[in-house]
Amino acid sequence: MKLVLAISLFLAAPLVARAPSIPAADAPQLAALGANPVGLQSTTVTVAGTARSLAVMVWYPALHGGTSTTYRRHLEPATGAALDITTDGIAVADATPAAGRFPLVVISHGFGGWAAGMTYLAENLASKGYVVASIDHADGQGGGGGSAGLVRVAGAIINRARDQQAVIAALSARAAAPNDTIGRHIDATNIAVIGYSMGGFGVVATGGAPYDKAAPSLSPLGGLLDDQTVRKTIPGLKAIVAIAPWGGQPPYRAWSEAGLRGLAVPSLFIAGDRDDVSIYADGIHWLYDHATASNRWLLTYREARHNVGGNPPPPETLTRPDLAENFAEPVWRSDRINAINQHFVTAFLDRFLKGDAAHGAFLDVPTVDSDVAQWPAAGPGFATSAQAGYWPGFQKRWLLGLELRHDAAR
């Protein structure tokens, strides 16, 4: 009877919330938080030549911990009632920054997203010695349907790369000011941009691939899509991460094959092979295949759709079928995707922004298909690069359903 009561109480107890930046026990090795506490400040950036003023959240390595942040967002979906959602964090508002300069990572969310929608990456990377700036692109809410929705989509297409480059320019300028509270901790010679969905659309252009303005999806925009705002080279930009990038798929294809060869910085593409928004084969994989001047990787989640870039579903959305498809995946656990992204993004950025060959070696997997990898050791633990046949950093029994392809620049 006591055992039955104990089990009943356990099952009835609420799960303790965990900040998305803290990986679960099944996470691969480099997903773990770094040694630094995390601070958080907010700033604004004005896009040159426009009236756009962007709110930007900046996470950074801090000297000390403290009361952690709870992120809040008011959602107004296209259908159903509005609601408020919360996400736990580990960052401490206005904490004193740690000494030194750190590489800059800019995060750009998907259409209708918000600056705190990818805190699983932002806080995690800041704990590892990066200054992370996440843009609120202010797309508005309510989806892309109807005339108002089409205006919002057009605005996102026009502004994504501009916004990213404006934030890079503003924070790089602050890095040159020795007394700037955040700028003096930014290493503007080592910059990466991470974009998810529509953010990925901008990232490919920011990385150096000019849009094909004659493309059917772009030609109606006319002179509004000014290539002069999409610079061919950005000082300090060393790498991009494109998560489920939009804009490669017909009929919305925004690049020519020749234009994609302008993407010359190292790139990490992340996608689900069942993506029904950006489309895997004719969209994301097509972008990857034709970015031939980039030293590039493609991480694929088999049986995953489009939601491979954001935080796990907020608890408040779990009983809302109209919201589930905006956050959750039908097969994969979202926190599992987050942890794998944390692992590989850390390996990639450490390799190209910090010159960390040891962490960079975690990209050198022995098999493209995770399912044919063989566990080389007798017991549990993380596989090392010295253990041939298994992806380094993954644990026994926890390597399934992935592909990691690499193609050198040519």
Positions of the model-derived regions?
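Domain-level recognition of soluble alpha/beta enzyme cores
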Residues: 20-107, 127
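Short substrate-entry loop that stabilizes the transition state in hydrolases
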Residues: 65, 88-102, 107-145, 249-250, ...
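The feature captures the conserved acid-bearing segment of alpha/beta-hydrolase catalytic domains
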Residues: 96, 221-301
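Alpha/beta-hydrolase active-site loop
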Residues: 152-188, 205
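Residue in the alpha/beta-hydrolase core beta-strand immediately N-terminal to the catalytic nucleophile
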Residues: 190-192
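Alpha/beta-hydrolase-fold serine-hydrolase catalytic core, especially in secreted/extracellular enzymes
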Residues: 294, 303-306, 311-410
